[in-house]
Amino acid sequence: MSEQHAQGADAVVDLNNELKTRREKLANLREQGIAFPNDFRRDHTSDQLHAEFDGKENEELEALNIEVAVAGRMMTRRIMGKASFVTLQDVGGRIQLYVARDDLPEGVYNEQFKKWDLGDILGAKGKLFKTKTGELSIHCTELRLLTKALRPLPDKFHGLQDQEARYRQRYLDLISNDESRNTFKVRSQILSGIRQFMVNRGFMEVETPMMQVIPGGAAARPFITHHNALDLDMYLRIAPELYLKRLVVGGFERVFEINRNFRNEGISVRHNPEFTMMELYMAYADYKDLIELTESLFRTLAQDILGKTEVTYGDVTLDFGKPFEKLTMREAIKKYRPETDMADLDNFDSAKAIAESIGIHVEKSWGLGRIVTEIFEEVAEAHLIQPTFITEYPAEVSPLARRNDINPEITDRFEFFIGGREIGNGFSELNDAEDQAQRFLDQVAAKDAGDDEAMFYDEDYVTALEHGLPPTAGLGIGIDRMVMLFTNSHTIRDVILFPAMRPVK
């Protein structure tokens, strides 16, 4: 047996022994009838204590004689004879406990406390004081075991280092890694901040179907499920767009939804098949109004959550404080591929030649607009590091957007990029029912030609438009990618609590 295999075998034996010992301790607690008590109540979390009392000296704390009750997971323990120090972790952070044998009821220290294990969940009462090193601590007068942990913490509090294990066992990741806990706290703050921002602007939050008979609102491959009661195949939604615009037809002039979308596509550092989007629709507005809204939203969130408008992402500082750059798609191609002759982007054969020269395989079903879009994505997208709006998307790749009044080959649409990736997509909505019907037919033709991401024909949506959709603008923002930016995370799995993973066999 190799040394590495021997070490692995020893580790398994050690773990099995520890599991056995912990279960024996639980069995003993069951015999005493105190295995899982539920009558302990805390009155502070660790962050509340630090916020209120870190600034006070020990003499002041002793004079105040403050008694508190806390609860959390025992992360470290230093036993020094008749006294010990414990690090207790709760939702707010950590607080130190000072546990002395003579200050607890008889037998608690030796017969109970010293037999508890790291990872156990404790309740503690006592008085606040500061150690000689100035650390805020609780001098315990009561200490109880609330939950017996049957498994040890990962690597004895050095954190869960295996990346895949962090995703599969997120609970261990959250116990062990401060960075992960902070990421998901920021995510929650972002969601709350978006909701507050939208309400302040007069928007109403709504909910639309997650299962749809006709998937629509985006070009993507859907997941299929079956409704037993209706004996009907249905699709997990790829976007809520068409339902939200039905609500605008119905008279709700400013609506938004934050919810999950599902797309049966690949998994990468930027893509998870189940992801969170915020979509909004605003009557009597155009795409320019939503450019302003998007810029204001990101600036507001950065200031409110991070306390500044400069955000560090990798080795780049993203500046949300200054006006965001605005380029047309063709301007971006020219900027990042200067040798491009702009006239070539108006000709199918010339554009196809450019695309093929930079390694793009041109599908038979693509028209000029799709080719130009693919060229943009290949030569420009990765360079859009600072916040940038790209406008003038071809109508061919924008089946739901309003055509431009001057040039009907392009639409009044923008995509929003930060850090070299798309974060948001917005446009003036197509409210011409006849034009929409024809574009749906074009999408059906593309699907018949082999494009499995082309849209279905949605007859009811066309009927809704025939009742009259006011001039409207819509916007979708990827929440997961937004969280990645605000937390300096470089894979989408780091910002989704339970990302899609292949099952372990």
Swiss-Prot record:
Binds 3 Mg(2+) ions per subunit. Its cofactor is Mg(2+). InterPro entries: Aa-tRNA-synt_II (IPR004364), aa-tRNA-synth_II (IPR006195), aa-tRNA-synth_II/BPL/LPL (IPR045864), Lys-tRNA-ligase_II (IPR002313), Lys-tRNA-ligase_II_bac/euk (IPR034762), Lys-tRNA-ligase_II_N (IPR044136), Lys-tRNA-synth_II_C (IPR018149), NA-bd_OB-fold (IPR012340). Mg(2+) 2 binds at E422. Mg(2+) 1 binds at E415, E422. It comes from the Bacteria. It holds the Pfam family tRNA_anti-codon. It catalyses: tRNA(Lys) + L-lysine + ATP = L-lysyl-tRNA(Lys) + AMP + diphosphate. The keyword ATP-binding applies. Its EC number is 6.1.1.6. The modification N6-acetyllysine is found at K114, K156. The keyword Magnesium applies. Its main location: cytoplasm. It is found in: Cytoplasm. GO terms for molecular function: ATP binding; lysine-tRNA ligase activity; magnesium ion binding; tRNA binding. GO terms for biological process: lysyl-tRNA aminoacylation. Keywords: Acetylation, Aminoacyl-tRNA synthetase, ATP-binding, Cytoplasm, Ligase, Magnesium, Metal-binding, Nucleotide-binding, Protein biosynthesis. Homodimer. Belongs to the class-II aminoacyl-tRNA synthetase family. This is Lysine--tRNA ligase. The gene is lysS.
